[in-house]
Amino acid sequence: MIFSEQILFSLGAEVLQYEVNELIFSDGQRPNYYYQVSMGAVKLTKDRENGTETILSIFLSGECFAETFLFDNKAYPFNAVAMELYKIFRVPGERFVYFAKNTQESLLKLYCYNADKLSFY
């Protein structure tokens, strides 16, 4: 788990539940939240002009996704979709960015997590 439940709740996290194939956020939407999987799996997808869907990445329990978009406020270039019955922590983006910028340990965790993700590509 990237950040403990205690830390997430101290930042105002909500726990949301999603059904299979339910959209969490869509391509073009601005980032407003930090997302961390509590239970289940989520996929990041890109819809193609020919009607097909490309899976870009899959995230499992304890992992966060699309967090880097909070730091530059660029729109998401993909969709996030629940793959199975799914619970997620959702933290308001401004609170999470403030926490990350002001807590050296949190930035180190994010850097290490992202470096680990990139090592699989």
Locate predicted features.
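Hydrophobic recognition helices of helix-based DNA-binding modules
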Residues: 1, 44, 118-121
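Cyclic nucleotide-binding regulatory module and flanking cytosolic helices
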Residues: 1-22, 64-65, 69-74, 102
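Short, surface-exposed, charge-dense and proline/glycine-enriched linear segments
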Residues: 9, 81-88, 112
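Cyclic nucleotide-binding regulatory domains
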Residues: 22-85
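Nucleotide phosphate-binding site architecture
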Residues: 25, 89, 97
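A small-molecule sensor/coupling module
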Residues: 95-121
